[in-house]
């Protein structure tokens, strides 16, 4: 299977970034934003080869004249036409492969509507003529990537966060919790609190600038109240950021107020539990005998877990919730941004996985519903 001409393709379609590459590789070959941009203005110059839509990095670089749309919201594909464009771009422009020659492993968030994966299956077989495909749960792949068979994964990306407890390779579906609070909500929140400082960010293109500020300057405070006091008393926490037009803005307590919303969703006006409580609640829904193993193997994955300080804060918060004698270990591998993709690469190249693929023949025989029988 490791031979490049029949290597399986692994495509992790995140709400924010699409990660794609070949099974057996240790990192995705293509990582680009899951965006489709359409011009906001009329084209006037003939022969410029203007397109009616742009995908990924090209959309990002021309964002000043485009309206950018994300076809995946909260981990669910909401715009199938745009999603097809992204897949088309992935196969033909990024990986430069013929999709009808390679099996494809796709990923999705747990507790997604069933129709979502049926439609994914249908498009892969009918539009792209894939020989075989499989849909895997994102958090399960992250656990593969960390080399464990038992643990609880907190996977937090751009659109959705979820906690999935897995014991000896079995996911425990009754204890899976999903939180529709993730990176994109934090970007929106940062846009809002920067407005209070007098910086106005409103368009879809400016939102991308704010996302960059968030990724470069934000961090999670170990003690929020104390950090707020420090920020108020001195300028030691202030950092400056240069906008594309050369203007320099300064941000202070926004740096940690933004990701704090992960632990206090009330900042966003949401009535849900923070990520630490979600992990705890998920563990408490599991059998009493396996909780100890889950506390000791709490794996973080996804781009929204990349903030400096998040693992220490998580350790502190869960220690406060859990019984005092229990050992708590938060595993935050440095490559966790891509651990879903890496897990997919591992899974698709296992010899034992080869009989798990849904083949074109099986699809033709049973229709899209087969995906629920063959994929967890």
Curated annotation (Swiss-Prot):
The modification Methionine sulfoxide is found at residues 45, 48. Residues 1-2 form a propeptide. It catalyses: ATP + H2O = ADP + phosphate + H(+). Keywords: Acetylation, ATP-binding, Cytoplasm, Cytoskeleton, Hydrolase, Muscle protein, Nucleotide-binding, Oxidation. It comes from the Eukaryota. PROSITE patterns: ACTINS_1, ACTINS_2, ACTINS_ACT_LIKE. One of its GO terms (molecular function) is ATP binding. GO terms for cellular component: cytoplasm; cytoskeleton. Pfam families: Actin. Actins are highly conserved proteins that are involved in various types of cell motility and are ubiquitously expressed in all eukaryotic cells. This is Actin, muscle.
